[in-house]
From Swiss-Prot:
Allosterically activated by GTP, when glutamine is the substrate; GTP has no effect on the reaction when ammonia is the substrate. The allosteric effector GTP functions by stabilizing the protein conformation that binds the tetrahedral intermediate(s) formed during glutamine hydrolysis. Inhibited by the product CTP, via allosteric rather than competitive inhibition. This is CTP synthase. The active site is at residues 379, 506, 508. The keyword Signal does not apply. One of its GO terms (biological process) is 'de novo' CTP biosynthetic process. Homotetramer. Its EC number is 6.3.4.2. GO terms for molecular function: ATP binding; CTP synthase activity; glutaminase activity; identical protein binding; metal ion binding.
Length: 537
């Protein structure tokens, strides 16, 4: 087999941080001069998470080639340089759909279609396709869910078969939770033992066990886990809860020397990893930096994972400017919304769907425009800006988006050509990376280091109605970014405002700790200028 494969499974509890672990391993292996690819296998029956409630699932992360994926792919991107595409994510829904489609087309020649071998063969093909697409030295495969869940069984059986055929080229890391009982002042390894026992019962013997814990495990506990789980003592690794930031994770894994174990086990030709630049950034994040307050106005603010990439992009940009982003979640339905915004240095309205909270976001944009507070509207946040401007500057009182009011006499935001939200919702939006031409002299042009052509990722169905663009521009709302050749409105700026910008795309999806997105840097710069203004109380 031309590549090596690391399978990452989880046990005891969910939300262990497998995605962060996979991303951290990718970073370390890349620093050992290996080419790494990533694959997330999710056991849910949705074809993709695109139609799932953010409260239930968290944010939807979009790849360059227009695939709606799990938020873990955002972690993969922010930590590593692994190329992510439609071959980096698969769900049970996708896999079952492919098998059923082939059965309907007669591809199985009358055979009884079963989980084994048809579903498991399809899962194996997904793994092979991911490797073929990216040609990695190492493919890291994260299996969603928890060992013992019924829905994960086909994936685990596929992994068992894959390992059987390629035993020398595969490694399984099983991640577990080792709880600490405060009353007894001790950690308990029994849940880990039971989880490994369940995994072994499926036919998978882990090569290493990665123990997540609140406190460091003693050598005695590690030895106990080694003995009862039948793995070498040196293959029991421990990561404790991070103290300050998730970006500590690669440093913790490097300290455990897990990459050395992987290299020996898979016979990889590597060099020692150099994480010095990463360590510098993590140390900065751990300092008591001056804060910049950013109000994020949305309807899912109680669930931070719903805006994960937004929050991380703000953190990246603030750190680049020597500050810590203090993110103030503001519910778009909060009656005291403007009072809360008055205490912030800037406001960001992220993407979203639906009428709930819409008028609150309009109120936030109006308040920021009138008070000179820096405003960054992303996707829906840009549409909020345009509708507010039309209502209160163009005096089109009933201006609205067709999404919010299908009967509005002034559809400032309308459905894109070829889009019909009533026909189908899953995977039908304008998705993925598209080019954008920037207008010289604009704030956006300056932020992008005066590049004339950029490319950003999209996820939307509605756009600014071109019938109103001339009137908007005549009243001071500049269209400074357009998508060729149709000229779709991509970036807008308010001329007489210090920094009020809306973008139809999602810049947060490409921000990294080591390379913050330029628009977020410009936004934080504007917030810092505003915070120093003597008139800001």
């Amino acid at each position: 087999m031309p590549f090596k494969c690391i399978f990452l499974t989880g046990g005891v509890v969910s939300s262990l941080g497998k995605g962060l672990t996979a991303a951290s391993l990718a970073l370390i292996l890349e620093r050992q001069r290996l080419n790494v690819a990533m694959l997330k296998l999710d056991p849910y029956l949705n074809v993709d998470p695109g139609t799932m409630n953010p409260f239930e699932h968290g944010e939807i992360y979009v790849t360059d080639d227009g695939v709606e994926t799990d938020l873990d792919l955002g972690h993969y991107h922010r930590f590593s340089s692994a190329a992510l595409s439609r071959h980096s994510s698969a769900t049970s829904g996708q896999i079952y759909a492919r098998v059923i489609k082939r059965e309907r087309e007669g591809d199985y020649l009358g055979s009884t279609v079963q989980v084994i071998p048809h579903i498991t063969n399809e899962i194996i093909q997904v793994i092979l396709d991911a490797a073929k697409e990216h040609s990695p030295d190492v493919l890291i495969v994260e299996i969603g869910g928890t060992i013992g869940d019924i829905e994960s069984l086909p994936f685990l059986e596929a992994i068992r078969q894959f390992r059987y055929d390629h035993s020398e080229d595969c490694l399984n890391i099983h991640m577990t939770y080792v709880p600490y009982l405060q009353a007894a002042d001790e950690v308990k390894s029994k849940p880990t033992q039971h989880s490994v026992q369940t995994l072994r019962g499926i036919g998978i013997i882990p090569d290493a066990i990665l123990c997540r814990s609140e406190k460091p495990l003693t050598q005695e506990v590690k030895s106990k886990i080694s003995l009862f789980c039948n793995v070498p003592n040196r293959a029991v690794f421990n990561v404790i809860d991070v103290k300050h930031t998730i970006y500590e994770m690669p440093l913790m894994l490097a300290q455990e020397k897990i990459a050395n174990f992987i290299g020996e086990k898979l016979k990889l030709a590597t060099v020692p990893e150099n994480l010095d630049d990463w360590r510098v950034l993590v140390n900065q994040l751990s300092q008591d930096l001056p804060k910049v307050k950013i109000g994020v106005v949305g309807k899912y603010v109680q669930h931070r994972d719903a805006y994960k990439s937004i929050f991380e992009a703000l953190t990246h940009a603030a750190l680049r400017l020597g500050h810590a982003a203090e993110i103030i979640p503001i519910d778009a339905e909060d009656e005291n919304l403007t009072m809360e915004l008055s205490q912030c240095d800037a406001c960001l309205v992220p993407g979203g769907f639906g009428v709930r909270g819409w008028e609150g976001k309009i109120a936030a944009a109006k308040f920021c425009r009138e008070q000179g507070i820096p405003y960054f509207g992303i996707c829906l946040g840009m549409q909020v800006l345009v509708v507010e401007y039309a209502r209160n500057v163009l005096n089109l009182d009933q201006a609205n988006s067709l999404e919010m009011d299908p009967n509005t006499p002034h559809p400032i935001v309308y459905v894109m050509e070829g889009q019909d939200p009533l026909v189908a919702t899953g995977g039908t939006m304008r998705l993925g990376a598209y080019p954008c031409l920037l207008k010289p002299g604009s704030k956006a042009h300056k932020a992008y280091n005066e590049s004339s052509l950029i490319q950003e990722r999209h996820r939307h169905r509605y756009e600014v109605n071109p019938d109103y663009i001339q009137s908007l521009e005549d009243h001071g709302l500049r269209i400074v970014g357009t998508c060729p050749p149709q000229g779709l409105c991509e970036i807008i700026e308010v001329s007489d405002h210090p920094w009020m910008i809306g973008v139809q795309f999602h810049p947060e999806f490409v921000s990294k700790l080591i390379s913050p997105h330029p628009l977020f840097i410009a936004f934080i710069e504007a917030a810092l200028v505003y915070s120093k203004d003597a008139s800001h109380v």
